């Protein structure tokens, strides 16, 4: 099966979480993602477009960080915002803000012969007051509920807590039920 993305970090996470089930191949593809407020709609539209070019089963994923005090910003624009202002910029926007509640959402679209299946993962948490740990993207500033560590401090343990881990578990259940080797 193929994971199509321009983000190798995402591929590494999915490969790690699915390695016992499928042989996941990385197709590095940079495509124009439609803009909008609905992450699910963005992913489905992108998968439909990519299915014109990729002729075997594949999946893509999009995610976003939604910060309550910022009215859901950066939301579906998370990748762009990270590239422009990074973690430090988000923390600057949150300077002096007491409400640190946020959530991460991950939406996977699996495209195969019978259509498109969508799997969503969502994790509630808070925004840290400083960058903590490594990782990539907003990992060093997001603390999932039930932990006192940021994603960046969790390392591979992040897979158990993360929004991407949650959506991947749903994809995994589908592949086990349907049979990943029988996808048309």
Swiss-Prot record:
Its cofactor is Mg(2+). GO terms for biological process: nucleoside triphosphate catabolic process; nucleotide metabolic process; purine nucleoside triphosphate catabolic process. It comes from the Archaea. Pfam families: Ham1p_like (PF01725). Binds 1 Mg(2+) ion per subunit. Mg(2+) binds at residues 33, 62. Gene3D superfamilies: 3.90.950.10. Its EC number is 3.6.1.66. One of its GO terms (cellular component) is cytoplasm. It is an enzyme of class 3 (hydrolase). The keyword Metal-binding applies. Keywords: Hydrolase, Magnesium, Metal-binding, Nucleotide metabolism, Nucleotide-binding. Pyrophosphatase that catalyzes the hydrolysis of nucleoside triphosphates to their monophosphate derivatives, with a high preference for the non-canonical purine nucleotides XTP (xanthosine triphosphate), dITP (deoxyinosine triphosphate) and ITP. Seems to function as a house-cleaning enzyme that removes non-canonical purine nucleotides from the nucleotide pool, thus preventing their incorporation into DNA/RNA and avoiding chromosomal lesions. Homodimer. This is dITP/XTP pyrophosphatase. It comes from Korarchaeum cryptofilum (strain OPF8).
């Amino acid at each position: 099966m193929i994971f199509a993305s321009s983000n190798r970090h995402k591929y590494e996470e999915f490969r790690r979480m699915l390695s016992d089930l499928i042989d996941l191949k990385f197709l590095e593809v940079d495509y124009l993602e439609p803009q909008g407020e609905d992450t699910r709609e963005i992913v489905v539209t992108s998968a439909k477009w990519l299915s014109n070019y990729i002729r075997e089963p594949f999946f893509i994923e999009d995610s976003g960080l939604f910060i309550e005090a910022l009215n859901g910003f950066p939301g579906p624009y998370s990748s762009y915002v990270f590239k422009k202002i990074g973690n430090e910029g988000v923390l600057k926007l949150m300077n002096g803000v007491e409400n640190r509640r946020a959530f991460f959402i991950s939406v996977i679209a699996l495209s195969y012969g019978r259509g498109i299946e969508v799997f969503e993962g969502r994790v509630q948490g808070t925004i840290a007051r400083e960058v903590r740990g490594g990782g990539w993207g907003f990992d060093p500033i997001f603390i999932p509920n039930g932990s006192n560590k940021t994603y960046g401090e969790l390392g591979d343990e992040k897979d158990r807590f993360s929004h991407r881990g949650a959506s991947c578990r749903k994809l995994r259940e589908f592949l086990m039920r349907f049979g990943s080797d029988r996808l048309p």
